[in-house]
């Protein structure tokens, strides 16, 4: 029976992480467990940055963006000797189990701690990219989506005023959920998704046809890492003779107070993680599917439960414009 658990956040921060930490801490305390916070992710674990938490440690954090525990990239965790030291540090505090909030890279580290060292670990999906396996939604995605839509709405105002073409680059890496849904909600004329090969010439020809038909402004939503959006803006302006500007939303999408959906989702997942640990389960990741909380073996989720690309949403956007 576990008596002490720890919680850490790893990888890129996401709105709602604090709500998840709060869910873990207060539900664990309710069950009579001692709870410790690991500061600065796996890096902090390796450097023994661990502090005991109480219910007041998480007072008012549900409204705050980011993660008060801090986060850090720590590729050295792939080294078995580094993981062994981390497990030793956890045991030196009497910690039996660990909740890891982050993406699939964070999940893999948690699974290895469970398999190699018997530390019961549960992963919670904390990333704005909505690309974690085994879940319909990740903690932070909905807030980031609202941030992106708000930015698109503001760009629409100025683009229409100046008869300008605006390119907005949205985060997501290799998952375009943010881009596609923000574009649909914001009424963007064009979507460039990472899952579909980018044809620059086709895009420019579409814009030329729209302008010939009387279009006075347009917004292009594009997922990050596909192309240099500032260079793309120059090429479009040269071809269509319309002022074209690129806006990179960047890390502003990670910040801000989490929306109600993310606060509730994160709280539910935090409580569910503690329930799993009390059942003696480790090496699992938590998700929400069809509105129900679920858990999957981490490796099975990573290998077999990748999110499928919803091409029908792109098709729908073409029909709407």
From Swiss-Prot:
Keywords (A to Z) from UniProt: Allosteric enzyme, ATP-binding, Cytoplasm, Glycolysis, Kinase, Magnesium, Metal-binding, Nucleotide-binding, Transferase
This protein's name: ATP-dependent 6-phosphofructokinase
Residues the record lists as binding ATP: 12, 73-74, 103-106
GO molecular function: 6-phosphofructokinase activity; AMP binding; ATP binding; fructose-6-phosphate binding; identical protein binding; metal ion binding; monosaccharide binding
Co-factor(s): Mg(2+)
Annotated substrate binding sites: 127-129, 164, 171-173, 224, 245, 251-254
A Gene Ontology biological process term: canonical glycolysis
E.C. no: 2.7.1.11
Any one cellular-component term (Gene Ontology): 6-phosphofructokinase complex
Involved pathway(s): Carbohydrate degradation; glycolysis; D-glyceraldehyde 3-phosphate and glycerone phosphate from D-glucose: step 3/4
Active site: 129 (proton acceptor)
Catalytic EC class: transferase
Family per record: Belongs to the phosphofructokinase type A (PFKA) family. ATP-dependent PFK group I subfamily. Prokaryotic clade 'B1' sub-subfamily.
HAMAP family listed in its UniProt record: Phosphofructokinase_I_B1 (MF_00339)
Domain of life: Bacteria
Catalytic reaction equation(s): beta-D-fructose 6-phosphate + ATP = beta-D-fructose 1,6-bisphosphate + ADP + H(+)
Regulation: Allosterically activated by ADP and other diphosphonucleosides, and allosterically inhibited by phosphoenolpyruvate.
Residues that hold Mg(2+) according to the record: 104
């Amino acid at each position: 029976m576990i008596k002490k658990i720890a919680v850490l956040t790893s990888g890129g921060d996401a709105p709602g992480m604090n709500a998840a930490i709060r869910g873990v801490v207060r539900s664990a305390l309710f069950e009579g467990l001692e709870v410790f916070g690991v500061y600065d992710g796996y890096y902090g674990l390796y450097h023994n940055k661990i502090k005991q938490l109480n219910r007041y440690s998480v007072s008012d954090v549900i409204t705050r963006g980011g993660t008060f525990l801090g986060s850090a990239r720590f590729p050295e965790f792939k080294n078995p000797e580094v993981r062994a030291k981390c497990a030793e540090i956890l045991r030196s505090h009497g910690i039996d189990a660990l909740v890891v909030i982050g993406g699939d890279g964070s999940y893999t580290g948690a699974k290895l701690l469970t398999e190699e060292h018997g530390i019961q670990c549960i992963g919670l999906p904390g990333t704005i990219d909505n690309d974690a396996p085994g879940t319909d939604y990740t903690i932070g995605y909905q807030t980031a989506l609202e941030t992106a839509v708000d930015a698109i709405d503001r760009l629409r105002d100025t683009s229409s005023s100046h008869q300008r073409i605006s390119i907005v680059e949205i985060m997501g890496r290799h998952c375009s959920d943010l881009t596609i849904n923000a574009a649909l909600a914001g009424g963007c004329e064009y979507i460039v998704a990472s899952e579909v090969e980018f044809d620059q010439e086709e895009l420019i020809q579409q814009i030329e046809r729209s302008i010939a038909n009387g279009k006075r402004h347009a917004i292009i939503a594009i997922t990050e890492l596909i192309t240099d959006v500032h260079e793309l803006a120059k090429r479009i302006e040269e071809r269509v003779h319309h002022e074209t500007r690129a806006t990179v939303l960047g890390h502003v999408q990670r910040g801000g107070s989490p929306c109600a959906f993310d606060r509730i989702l994160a709280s539910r997942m935090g409580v569910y993680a503690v329930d799993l640990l009390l059942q003696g389960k480790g090496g699992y990741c938590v998700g929400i599917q069809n509105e129900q909380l679920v858990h999957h073996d981490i490796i099975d989720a990573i290998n077999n439960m990748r999110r499928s690309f919803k091409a029908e949403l792109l098709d729908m956007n073409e029909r709407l414009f």
